[in-house]
């Protein structure tokens, strides 16, 4: 079958239908300015040879296992579209739970405040900026009049920080979200000690012996963002070791972790002296997020 039209490319590809349509739709949009609906409305129009060559390269990349998100350089996350590349993890649906939890916490604070709130949030291991930017975007769309928020994203990778900056600019969020290259807390300004209402993190938590590291998309993602090369809990220990220095009294920390790590992470939260420790399930019922709260300087019952 000659490869000359959208339909002929889709009919002849060994890729599954979903991947093929995402990749080809992206290519038509980028190369010809066609909307995704052109996969149907223009399925018989002759395509330029240059586009067909690009398609064959994308097709081959996917057949070799390269993630679709890296091939098109985009990934949707919690209502926003992010630029992604192999220097950062591909944002996943389960990480959206961290954003939802943060929104829940912020709404609770708004409910109990009779004035405009000013909140500062720290996203440790920000990668593409997914958590920081999704949270800032959600707040922008809802509670602008009752809340002023500042979000700080931290990552040890300079390439990740560059990409996160680009995403902030593309989403028009660079006025409320800033990114700092830092190995966890190392380069955070001292004047921010004790100033964060929320600390969020999706740290490297996969055990280095886990065979999944050699399967699927994980083969192509940055290993340092997946595993601590220890036991899957070392980065969580490092985060918890200093979290009380940076949290405000009554501030909350929320950590994503593996489906079988909840009990261990709760134990670490308790060891760090945090209160109200609990785990939250993902949509499949697996406990994937654990949280703890710093004790307030003044007990809530004694506040006026």
Language-model segments: what does each one mean?
Residues 23, 27, 65, 95, ...:
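Residue-level signal for inorganic ion chemistry
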Residues 230-293:
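Conserved Class I SAM-dependent methyltransferase catalytic core
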Residues 81, 150, 176-178, 275-278:
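Conserved beta-strand segments of alpha/beta enzyme cores
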Residues 97-212:
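Conserved SAM/SAH cofactor-binding pocket of Class I
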Residues 1-21:
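Non-catalytic nucleic-acid substrate-recognition regions in nucleic-acid-modifying enzymes
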Residues 204-235:
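Mobile active-site "lid"/loop adjacent to the S-adenosyl-L-methionine
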Residues 289-304:
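C-terminal lobe and adjacent flexible extensions of AdoMet/dcAdoMet transferase-like proteins
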Residues 26, 30-105:
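Conserved AdoMet
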């Amino acid at each position: 079958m000659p490869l000359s039209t959208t339909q002929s490319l889709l009919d002849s590809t060994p890729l599954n239908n979903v991947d093929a349509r995402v990749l080809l739709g992206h290519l038509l949009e980028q190369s010809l300015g066609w909307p995704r609906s052109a996969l149907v409305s223009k399925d018989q129009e002759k395509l330029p040879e240059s586009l067909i060559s690009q398609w064959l390269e994308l097709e081959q990349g996917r057949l070799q296992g390269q993630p679709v998100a890296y091939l098109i350089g985009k990934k949707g996350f919690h209502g926003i579209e992010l630029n992604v590349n192999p220097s950062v993890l591909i944002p996943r649906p389960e990480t959206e739970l961290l954003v939802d939890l943060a929104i829940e916490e912020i709404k609770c604070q708004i409910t109990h405040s009779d004035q405009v709130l000013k909140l500062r949030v720290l996203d440790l291991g920000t990668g593409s900026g997914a958590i920081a930017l999704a949270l800032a975007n959600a707040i922008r769309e809802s509670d602008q009049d009752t809340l002023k928020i500042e979000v700080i994203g931290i990552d040890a990778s300079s390439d990740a920080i560059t990409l996160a900056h680009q995403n902030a600019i593309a989403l028009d969020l660079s006025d409320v979200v800033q990114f700092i290259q830092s190995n966890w807390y190392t380069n955070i300004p001292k004047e921010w000690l004790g100033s964060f209402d929320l600390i969020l993190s999706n740290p490297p938590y996969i055990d280095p012996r886990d065979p999944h590291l050699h399967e699927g998309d994980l083969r192509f993602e940055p290993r340092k963002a997946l595993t601590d090369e220890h036991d899957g809990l070392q980065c969580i220990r490092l985060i918890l070791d200093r979290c009380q220095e940076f949290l405000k009294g009554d501030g909350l920390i929320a950590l994503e972790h593996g489906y079988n790590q909840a009990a261990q992470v709760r134990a670490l939260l308790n060891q760090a002296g945090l209160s109200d420790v609990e785990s939250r399930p993902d949509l499949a019922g697996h406990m994937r997020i654990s949280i703890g709260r710093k004790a307030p300087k003044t007990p809530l019952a004694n506040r006026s």
